[in-house]
Amino acid sequence: MAESMLGLNRSHRCAEVVNAPLESEVTVMGWVQKNRNKGGIIFCDLRDRSGILQIIFEEDECGSEVFNKAMKLKQEFCIAVTGILKKRSGAFNESLATGELEVRATGLRILSESDTPPFHIEEDSKTKEELRLKYRFLDLRRPDLQRNLMVRSKVATTT
């Protein structure tokens, strides 16, 4: 069931956490890109228009209520996460601006649930154009199309 955003404010976009001090509390919002349950710890890739950020749900740190909610997350759920920004202890992902960082979740709100999308929302989608046009609202979440829209907006506002 979806929850309200009442009283909740985003502190950073996903890619902007690189400017936040380590060990600070951050609140990020976006769509679930991937969710991996490794038994006792859940890894969630959160995506917004700025990029992708890894969120860690560990039952000992976030509590059983938040952990049980995190177990229900699926691709394209819209969520808000509050947690502590930390440097990744394991392998870094050099292809991401936030590849050295993670958020250790202390709170989770599911803002909107989603059915399984008809295609993966990623940079190099091999999906047929006909299907992408049918689900244009999902296709516009892809990073390359978002970049195009931002450039178009900048050009339109400068002329």
What are these regions (language model features)?
Residues M1-T159:
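Class II aminoacyl-tRNA synthetase catalytic cores and aaRS-like
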